């Protein structure tokens, strides 16, 4: 039986004695949030920051990116869904050692508007193939599903973004801690 499982799925069977604890690093977001979170955000987790417009969520996310690069040497991916991230925002964070050259911005371009499915597929790919990275999604509330972007405005039978997000979260939840990716 064991040989059949290994043949079909690879080396997925482990002796209980071989299981070791891999302590997860706690990544610094910024001083105030670190205090509120008991030190920061554990790597390999999905961290959602909410709040009204113009309270500093994007600046906090960029500070998180700078800390991830500076202190933990993380690859950083930033999904600029709202399209509001500007060069001046990145320049304002250079004092915090954000290396914009080592950061990948994911965003729609003229003639190529990314749907929720496409954005989340890109992030899903990062989660599965870029261990130890940090992926920022700015912001979930700006996501529009493919059917919302291309469908008839009178058609109420569209796949909601909430369903897309739920599927995305289920897909990545077990992979995040194994690959130590923080979203």
Where are these regions (language model features)?
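Intrinsically disordered, low-complexity linker/loop segments enriched in Gly/Pro
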Residues: 79-82, 98-108, 140-141, 148-149
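The Walker A/P-loop phosphate-binding site
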Residues: 1-100, 115, 120-128
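Residue-level recognition of the N-termini of beta-strands and the immediately preceding loop/turn
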Residues: 74-76, 103, 133, 181
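Short, basic, glycine/proline-bearing loop/turn elements
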Residues: 47-51, 100-111, 153-160
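P-loop NTPase motor core
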Residues: 111-183
């Amino acid at each position: 039986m064991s040989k059949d499982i290994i043949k079909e799925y690879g080396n997925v069977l482990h002796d209980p004695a071989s299981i070791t604890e891999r302590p997860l690093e706690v990544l610094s977001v910024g001083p105030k949030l670190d205090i509120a979170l008991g030190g920061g955000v554990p790597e390999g987790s999905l961290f959602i920051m909410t709040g009204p417009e113009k309270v500093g969520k994007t600046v906090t996310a960029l500070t998180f990116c700078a800390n991830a690069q500076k202190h933990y040497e993380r690859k950083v991916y930033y999904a600029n869904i709202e399209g509001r991230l500007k060069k001046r925002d990145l320049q304002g964070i250079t004092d915090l050692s954000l290396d914009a050259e080592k950061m990948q911005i994911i965003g729609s371009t003229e003639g190529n508007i990314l749907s929720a499915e496409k954005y989340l597929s890109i992030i899903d790919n990062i989660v599965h193939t870029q261990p130890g990275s940090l992926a920022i999604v700015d912001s979930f509330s700006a996501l529009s599903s493919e059917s919302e972007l291309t469908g008839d405005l009178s058609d109420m039978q569209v796949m909601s973004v909430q369903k897309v997000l739920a599927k995305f979260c289920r897909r990545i939840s077990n992979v995040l801690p194994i690959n130590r990716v923080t979203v």
